[in-house]
Design a protein with these regions (language model features):
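Cell-wall polysaccharide-cleaving catalytic domain and substrate-binding groove, primarily
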Residues: 1-87, 96-193, 199, 205, ...
């Protein structure tokens, strides 16, 4: 399976769609329709989506070739298009390229799966800030010193409320119990007839083996695995 095929399987996931919506909102291109994908730096629209417009536009003290829903700079788009074999600047291809940029930037904190675990958390925003200037770093400022959106705004767009702590981040035994722990506790309780007793060495070995059998293997994200592959030699 190619990287492009893997990305096509990921781009429709709710967590990815929410993150892409956040970026469009932050970059000022979210217009609720196909025009979002035609926006050039400064707000004017590209005539079509046959290719990246590659026009240097000056406005507000800045000059940029940024274009599309995710404001791809011309060199950035060319790099993504080459890597994924994209032949035009269509909305579908822009989503694929943006998902690849998301994946690359999030690799340092766990890959795309971190979006499903944490939502648009402060460290997710900070990891993406070097790619999109409108996203805040952990200090709340733009990585490039440009105007930036508030994290609370972005979290609302993502579909979550800012919370000081997530139950998913609590340690087992502090406000929650893992499914494996709950199952194992019930199993051992039933085996012992709910009566505490001193366990023999054999019993302890059996419990350890049972705990290992019931502990699920860690999930491996194929996109993250592919991104970490290096050529041999």
């Amino acid at each position: 399976m190619t990287e492009r095929e893997l990305l096509q399987g990921y781009v429709s996931k709710p967590a990815i769609q929410n993150a892409l919506r956040v970026i469009r909102f932050a970059e000022g291109t979210e217009r609720g329709g196909p025009d979002s994908y035609r926006v050039m730096f400064g707000g004017s629209l590209a005539p079509d989506l046959k290719r990246h417009p590659d026009r240097a536009i000056t406005g507000g003290g800045y000059t940029s070739t940024a274009a599309g829903a995710y404001q791809f700079l011309s060199p950035t788009w060319n790099e993504q298009a080459k890597a994924l074999g994209l032949s035009d600047f269509s909305a579908q291809n822009q989503d694929l390229a943006a998902t690849r940029l998301l994946r690359n930037r999030l690799m340092s904190i766990g890959g795309l799966s971190v979006l499903e675990k944490e939502g648009f958390s402060p460290r997710v925003s900070a990891a993406l800030a070097p790619e999109w200037a409108s996203l805040p770093t952990e200090s709340g400022k733009s990585y490039y010193g440009q105007p930036v959106k508030k994290l609370s705004e972005l979290q609302k767009i993502y579909g979550q409320a800012a919370q000081p702590a997530s139950t998913a981040q609590q340690e087992p035994g502090k406000g929650q119990e893992t499914s494996t722990g709950s199952f194992l506790q019930g199993f051992m309780s039933a085996m012992a007839g709910n009566q505490p007793k001193e366990l023999s060495t054999t019993d302890l070995v059996k419990q350890e083996l049972m705990a290992r059998l019931l502990t699920p293997a860690p999930e491996i994200d194929p996109l993250d695995f592919l991104a970490n592959m290096r050529p041999i030699g």
